[in-house]
Amino acid sequence: MGNVQSQEGETRAHAVPSQDATTTPDNANNVPKEPRAQSMISIAADDLNQEGEMSDDNQQEGGNNRTSQNGTSGSSGHTKRRSQTSGKKTHQPYSGPCVPTIIRWRGGGEVVYVTGSFSRWKKKIQLLKSEDYTVLLQLRPGTQRFKFLVDGIWCCSSDFPTATDAEGNLYNYLEVEANEKLGASIDERLSQVHTDLPMEEKSESEQYSTEIPAFLTSNTLQELKLPKPPSLPPHLEKCILNSNTAYKEDQSVLPNPNHVLLNHLAAANTQLGVLALSATTRYHRKYVTTAMFKNFDV
């Protein structure tokens, strides 16, 4: 870059004649040809930062040289970017102890993988088959979200709780608790678990008998008011088939439902001996609502 700037300085020095050259042509050869080129060559990479810090003072003084002002403003922008990047916090990976956790799949299949937040949803881990598909993972404490890939199909296990993300996709999650005694053996952990179980109460509750419950034989107990069933959540009270369509000409087009309404069975009151059932499912970005009607004899 220094060579290029010196060449530009030489061309400018030859192109623009000085005042001495116009008055005394004999002394034109004695005048130094590249005073501006020397000033530009002397600017190094370290000097740019110093010029950037002094750019505000130069703007207040209002120098006549525009090229120097442009150079200082560019260098000041460079120093601002370096200060912003130096202020960013670097991500520190988790260095604490991990908890050995067994993840099990009991839904069958030939090839089963699992992926989740513990691998940033980028790596698939294959499960080993014995009686069921299992894998032992070293997970950090906290909430871990994951999903199974069974024969190329994404599935959720009924053995773990499920939740939905912002787009309505289902996934399993697991609360991994930090164990203080990570060095304890498996036998010690199993002994602690089995000693806490009330074995006697469990055996008494599983006894069979031929006695009929009293509330089935006594008329007074049948007349007692049972507690009311819990009311439906507010988002399930609004059925999509009862909403007004945006297109009056085409009644088959329905508005997009809330993701909590998916895979719920809705039933209408039996009127005129017809039973109506409906369910809404999702396939990628499309929603399909199916209504079924059947004759019902009261």
From Swiss-Prot:
Highest taxon above the source species: Eukaryota
Gene Ontology CC annotations of this record: cytoplasm; cytosol; nucleotide-activated protein kinase complex; nucleus; plasma membrane
Protein location: Cytoplasm
One BP annotation, GO: induction of conjugation with cellular fusion
UniProt biased composition (Polar residues): 19-30, 60-77
Protein family (similarity comment): Belongs to the 5'-AMP-activated protein kinase beta subunit family.
Role played: Beta subunit of AMP-activated protein kinase (AMPK), which is required for transcriptional, metabolic, and developmental adaptations in response to glucose limitation. Has a structural role, mediating heterotrimer formation, and a regulatory role, defining carbon source-regulated subcellular location and substrate specificity of the AMPK kinase complex.
Record protein name field: 5'-AMP-activated protein kinase subunit beta
Organism the protein comes from: Schizosaccharomyces pombe (strain 972 / ATCC 24843)
Lineage: Eukaryota, Fungi, Dikarya, Ascomycota, Taphrinomycotina
Gene it is expressed from: amk2
